[in-house]
């Protein structure tokens, strides 16, 4: 219903902010990763949102990137993971780190997040395996757009997320897309 808010950042009270849009202040719950990247109070801000309507509340969740919002939406589809738990996960680790933890099946990394027990972490690993990075278009280890393109190309060529991520780690950080794909294919052929 409300997909994006653009306005003036009126208040900052972690994990909630108030965005003033033409005189109307919207309370928005944000993950700490988004909170720390927000401008100062009184400055212009734009947040992608997810609107949750419950019997007792209507809550806006805000995100700095489309990847964060997509990951949030994937997380809340899982039984036992509500919006608060999903927000906690995204506050405890970046989307890339979460994608990497899912890809490499790192149970220990997930249970370190407050509110995530062993059973919930196991459910996350099971239900998100092969989905999180692919659905949101986010490579697990990509730091640049070129690295993201390289990883997506390798996955499109049939390599698993894990194989592609390992090949990407071995590449120089400044490799162009075409150079990176060639080098990664050579490394994967060995």
UniProtKB/Swiss-Prot annotation:
Subcellular location field: Cytoplasm
Gene3D superfamilies associated with the record: 5' to 3' exonuclease, C-terminal subdomain (1.10.150.20), DNA helicase RuvA subunit, C-terminal domain (1.10.8.10), Nucleic acid-binding proteins (2.40.50.140)
Record has Zinc as a keyword: no
InterPro entries per UniProt: DNA_helicase_Holl-junc_RuvA_I, Hlx-hairpin-Hlx_DNA-bd_motif, NA-bd_OB-fold, RuvA, RuvA_2-like, RuvA_C, RuvA_C_sf
GO annotation, biological process: DNA recombination; DNA repair
GO cellular component, one term: cytoplasm
Region Domain III: start-end pairs: 142-190
Segments for region (Flexible linker): 137-141
Family matches, as Pfam families: HHH_5, RuvA_C, RuvA_N
Keywords for the protein's UniProt record, in alphabetical order: Cytoplasm, DNA damage, DNA recombination, DNA repair, DNA-binding
Chain intervals for the UniProt region annotation (Domain II): 65-137
Region feature Domain I, mapped onto this chain: 1-64
MF terms in GO: ATP binding; four-way junction DNA binding; four-way junction helicase activity
UniProt cross-references to SUPFAM superfamilies, sorted A to Z: DNA helicase RuvA subunit, C-terminal domain, Nucleic acid-binding proteins, RuvA domain 2-like
Record-stated family: Belongs to the RuvA family.
Primary role: The RuvA-RuvB-RuvC complex processes Holliday junction (HJ) DNA during genetic recombination and DNA repair, while the RuvA-RuvB complex plays an important role in the rescue of blocked DNA replication forks via replication fork reversal (RFR). RuvA specifically binds to HJ cruciform DNA, conferring on it an open structure. The RuvB hexamer acts as an ATP-dependent pump, pulling dsDNA into and through the RuvAB complex. HJ branch migration allows RuvC to scan DNA until it finds its consensus sequence, where it cleaves and resolves the cruciform DNA.
Record's protein name: Holliday junction branch migration complex subunit RuvA
Source organism per UniProt: Variovorax paradoxus (strain S110)
Organism lineage: Bacteria, Pseudomonadati, Pseudomonadota, Betaproteobacteria, Burkholderiales
Gene it is expressed from: ruvA
